[in-house]
């Protein structure tokens, strides 16, 4: 059996992860990217400025931790954002500290969380801006709530940022003799390849007729910080009278030197947050494509609300399927 050839469309985190995993197993990988390496995780190597909002890597999966540590050193970072509300600043994640801040009261650390207060001041306006429709109170059941004092926004064993940025980490993933990268826009045509991995938006594939909607975000850079002095690098803007949903002091987050603040305003151009009407039908369509040698991967490729660790796990699953198919 000769060396298998793989075509990967997209050099974001999903594409780079798949490329490296398969290259290490002896596959010949051609990866195509129409813009720059990094996708929505792209940052500036010199200043560490993150172009598409704050990215903080976190996971509890030992396999994922071992994988990323092959390509980057990480510095620890614990994400404890601040909510900017009509009642003033409140600490996140949601805990009794949040309620103390909102009510301006001294409360026992074991006091029950006031869900009504959380919904009215943290969730309602933020969610309406983010998703373009009123929030349902049932969303409280899906939120991580600390009964006592709050910890990290992410309840994972590993949390931090690569010291040289995510872009550098992904470039290191592609540094393998079995990987060739071409900066060119292409489609899913697999002529000349044994398998194709698609990490672009799934609704750009030929024949994809399942309904996928996207919420886009406009990213606005500023030198002046309206929230100065800050209590944390990341502020969630939970009030209706400001358009933005989030404001990040990038240097405070990354340790860089861009001197820039990044604001996120919902409903801009781009495909950032997927909304799938029928997940089961979409997954069935993806499974049918796999039988034809076309594998969808990543946040855009599967229209899934993945964090970075989820994306790498998804890449591992896709590569495992391909390797098993080769053995069949």
Annotate each language-model stretch with its function.
Residues 42-50, 57-106, 146-147:
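A conserved beta-strand/loop capping segment in the N-terminal third of enzymes
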Residues 33, 78, 181-186, 298:
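Short loop/edge segments at beta-strand edges and connector loops
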Residues 14, 37, 203:
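Conserved Rossmann-like nucleotide-cofactor binding loop
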Residues 94, 249-328:
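Conserved flavin/dinucleotide-binding core of flavoenzymes
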Residues 83-195, 199-207:
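Active-site/ligand-binding neighborhood in enzyme catalytic cores
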Residues 4-31:
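N-terminal Rossmann-like FAD-binding beta1-loop-alpha1 element of flavoenzymes
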Residues 23-45:
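Glycine-rich FAD pyrophosphate-binding loop
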Residues 25, 186-285:
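Mid-domain catalytic core of redox enzymes
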